[in-house]
A protein has these predicted regions:
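Extended, low-hydrophobicity segments enriched in charged/polar residues
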Residues: 1-103
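Acidic, proline/glycine-rich low-complexity IDRs
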Residues: 87-150
């Protein structure tokens, strides 16, 4: 778990070195409080699940239905203003990042959203998520974060 923690801290450090764009730039620098960092093992099958719909049709109205927690699928397909991606795009991206023949070699952790102001935007409305994925076969980390507002 310590290597995952270091990878998450490094990912946030990299975000701080980049030019930020977006509609909410209230934090010019993302901070990390390591003492508040918590994680839990995340099931591989659940991580790659591609079937949870986040919309419910109620008469002529499309209503957002938030899952009990943000899933990777939700983060990819349901940002505040939508994306033009297909399920096929989701599968292609995952095949590039995590070739299916090696998925059993993945170690996935889901992180809490109380240790960094990176999550403040998402806490306002859309939601937050952060996963650290270690690919034992390729000896690399992939960090996926989500935190947006309108």
């Amino acid at each position: 778990m310590q290597s995952h923690k270091r990878a998450v801290i490094e990912a946030i450090s990299i975000l701080n070195s980049r030019v930020r764009v977006g509609n909410s730039l209230k934090h010019p620098h993302f901070s990390v409080d390591e003492d508040k960092m918590r994680c839990a093992v995340y099931d591989i099958e659940q991580f790659f699940c591609d079937g949870n719909s986040s919309w419910k049709i109620d008469g002529n109205t499309k209503v957002r239905v938030s899952p009990s927690h943000m899933t990777y699928w939700w983060a990819f397909f349901e940002p505040p203003y939508g994306v033009p991606y297909s399920k096929e795009d989701f599968h292609k991206l995952n095949h590039l990042l995590f070739p299916s023949q090696f998925r059993n070699d993945l170690e996935i952790f889901s992180w809490n959203d109380d240790f960094s102001n990176y999550f403040d935007d998402g806490k306002e409305w859309w939601g937050t998520a952060l996963w650290s994925i270690y690919d034992k076969w390729m000896s690399r980390f992939v960090i996926i974060g989500a935190s947006l507002t309108d």
